[in-house]
Amino acid sequence: MTAIVEPSVTTGPIAGSSKVYRELDGVPGARVPFRRVHLSTGDHFDLYDTSGPYTDPDATIDLTAGLPARPGRVRDRGTQLQRARAGEITAEMAFIAAREGMPAELVRDEVARGRAVIPANHNHPEIEPMIIGKAFATKVNANIGNSAVTSSIAEEVDKMVWATRWGADTIMDLSTGKNIHETREWILRNSPVPVGTVPIYQALEKVKGDPTLLTWEIYRDTVIEQCEQGVDYMTVHAGVLLRYVPLTAKRVTGIVSRGGSIMAAWCLAHHRESFLYTNFDELCEIFARYDVTFSLGDGLRPGSIADANDAAQFAELRTLGELTKIAKSHGVQVMIEGPGHVPMHKIVENVRLEEEWCEEAPFYTLGPLATDIAPAYDHITSAIGAAIIAQAGTAMLCYVTPKEHLGLPDRKDVKDGVIAYKIAAHAGDLAKGHPHAQERDNALSQARFEFRWNDQFALSLDPDTAREYHDETLPAEPAKTAHFCSMCGPKFCSMRITQDVRDYAAKHGLDSEEAIEAAMADKSREFAEHGNRVYLPLAQ
């Protein structure tokens, strides 16, 4: 690979953690990665890890050479869907089962039923296999990629490594500027997670940005080029049909999907049905050769609250259901993309209809944003909707950064978007009772109650920022074991008071109710002795 400037990326363990591996039975040389949090109690807590070798201090990182190929992969033996239907538990399925803490047979069964996908192109041997499906932990995708205005290969590779460090389960390279092929090659060869693309962007670049000049042959050749490189899943806007375009005429924001608008423009210019739709069978045959997963794009998704759940959106969704059946008949894995901008009370209907019309194919949604009024904070507006739609059964959430609608995200925006969406995904998993989801909450809550500050930081989604915020007011090392923080101070920490109650009960042989009454009486006297003041100077 060649690049204008060789990338420089962040490496080394996340604070309070180390990289550990578990040997995978039956697959010689295969090791399943985890982030191990080392607790001050002498125990440890292992977390799902997406960071690849970049957080392993013993790994040699050579971005020019790329990551090593994973052991156990088998080429030219069909797709994961075909092999699952045949009753085979592939090396990838076994790897995923160990990662997720789930039975391998469940992994195989969900893939066979089309309710889960394993994006793993035969030509992308660098990835650590993962699964997208509602029976498993909700995943998060991070979009990166250059534009015609800004960014470079080095910046995009750095964003990829940075996003996976903080928990991105997949990456989409949405480059639309210069060096699209080269940028994608650098990302693929160095990505430990599946990489998705939208091939119509590169196809459009080949015709100098004029949608009317696109042809099936140009698009097909672009898809094959990307399959050969190793792209794991591709967004295809094959559901944007000529007859659906007029349904968007009275929308507040029209067609907001780039791919959707490109195909709508082509359909109107030629007054013909989309070549993605009319050539879908051939596209399936190409995808099957490489085991590339369809991400059937929602080109008519709502771009504003006013347009949510309208006729255009749901007409396209029905067509995506038809295409899902066709793809599966070719043995190709499929997931369905979803909105968008949707008020909270309309979110669940999207999941219900997707599951009904698309045979429960994994749902992959962009947010949705629950309100339109907060540019610069759309990682928050969308995380609200994302948590709701995750609880309802969405399998993967596409992050939104603070720069959404405003500009190309930088490194900080990428991290902010990933963290916001890891929160939404985890909240959704908790709400739907996903196995293992609450274990991390319990571990952190216990550390919080026992004033093990360093353990709290290490167990959090963002240890660096948690420590930074704590240390802004209590930077001294003894504060890491203090039984208070700067919010309440040493006298009125609720958890310290509760600990005092428990200690009092144990010391005096009282049951909890008696202890509470006695201890609260003591605290009442203590409060009066300090002048009945709610807030005290930190020095006290």
UniProtKB/Swiss-Prot annotation:
An example of a Pfam family matching this protein is: ThiC_Rad_SAM
Residues binding substrate are 143, 172, 201, 237, 257-259, 298-301, 337, 364
Record-level GO cellular component terms:
cytosol
Q: EC number(s) per UniProt?
A: 4.1.99.17
What biological-process terms (Gene Ontology) are attached? thiamine biosynthetic process; thiamine diphosphate biosynthetic process
Q: How is the cofactor bound?
A: Binds 1 [4Fe-4S] cluster per subunit. The cluster is coordinated with 3 cysteines and an exchangeable S-adenosyl-L-methionine.
In this chain, [4Fe-4S] cluster is annotated as bound at 485, 488, 493
Would I find Oxidoreductase among this entry's keywords? no
Identify the residues that bind Zn(2+).
341, 405
The pathway this protein participates in, as annotated, is: Cofactor biosynthesis; thiamine diphosphate biosynthesis
GO-annotated molecular function: 4 iron, 4 sulfur cluster binding; carbon-carbon lyase activity; zinc ion binding
Q: Which residues form the signal peptide?
A: none
Q: Which domain of life is it from?
A: Bacteria
Cofactor(s) this protein cannot do without = [4Fe-4S] cluster
* Family the entry assigns: Belongs to the ThiC family.
Function of the molecule: Catalyzes the synthesis of the hydroxymethylpyrimidine phosphate (HMP-P) moiety of thiamine from aminoimidazole ribotide (AIR) in a radical S-adenosyl-L-methionine (SAM)-dependent reaction.
Full protein name: Phosphomethylpyrimidine synthase
Q: Which organism is it from?
A: Mycobacterium avium (strain 104)
